[in-house]
Regions:
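Glycoside hydrolase catalytic-domain groove-lining segments
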Residues: 1-141
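Aromatic-rich peripheral "rim/lid" segments of glycoside hydrolase catalytic domains that contact
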Residues: 141-159, 163-187
């Protein structure tokens, strides 16, 4: 079931890329996923590189699962690093379990902080680029951490996706955004 489902999604991504590039080869083909790869197999998506073998890291990965990574099909890939623990050190202190929207059960480990997520994504993407995403409303109660997550995503990923601007506008978080971008080397 895991292989069949993932193969169908990867086959669809290949077909969609072909159609997009046939219409206009200059258009970037891309996607968004959550960053929680250890449980993303539950929704049938293998956004890793075809050169990464998840069977070496995860007991759920079948021997053929590695054949259906689709990272090489993408020109643009954004992922949701939607974590309030920013550093690995901070995560290890809180050791909190995370229950993402697509998860059947709570997850834990260094995947579930921004720094750890970026580190693990670099490993599974095998040189394919990714843009780290943030969820602004997670930081209403601690705006300084908004600056930290922006900085970490800019330093450890290949860009920044902000979800979404309405939260920055409504809570007037421009100062925190500017600080994070400066500290992340983008301003």
């Amino acid at each position: 079931w895991l292989e069949w489902r993932t193969k169908n999604i990867t086959d669809f991504m290949a077909l969609a890329r072909k159609e997009v590039k046939a219409a206009n080869p200059r258009v970037s083909f891309g996607t968004y996923t959550g960053a929680w790869y250890p449980s993303y197999y539950e929704v049938g998506v293998n956004f890793a590189s075809k050169n990464y073998d998840p069977g070496k890291d995860f007991s759920w990965a079948t021997p053929e699962y590695k054949n259906y990574g689709y990272a090489e099909l993408l020109d643009l890939y954004a992922t949701g690093n939607y974590y309030t623990d920013i550093t690995i050190e901070e995560y290890k202190k809180t050791n909190r379990s995370i229950w993402n929207e697509t998860d059947s059960q709570a997850q834990s480990g260094t995947w579930y902080c921004v720094e750890g997520s970026c580190r693990h994504l670099r490993h599974i993407l095998k040189g394919n680029k990714f843009i780290g995403g943030i969820l602004v409303d997670q930081f209403y109660d601690n705006p300084a951490k908004l600056s930290e997550t922006i900085e970490m995503n800019l330093r450890r990923s290949d860009g920044l996706m902000v979800f979404d601007i309405v939260h920055i506008i409504s809570k007037n978080l421009w100062k925190e955004v500017e600080e994070g971008m400066k500290n992340g080397g983008s301003l």
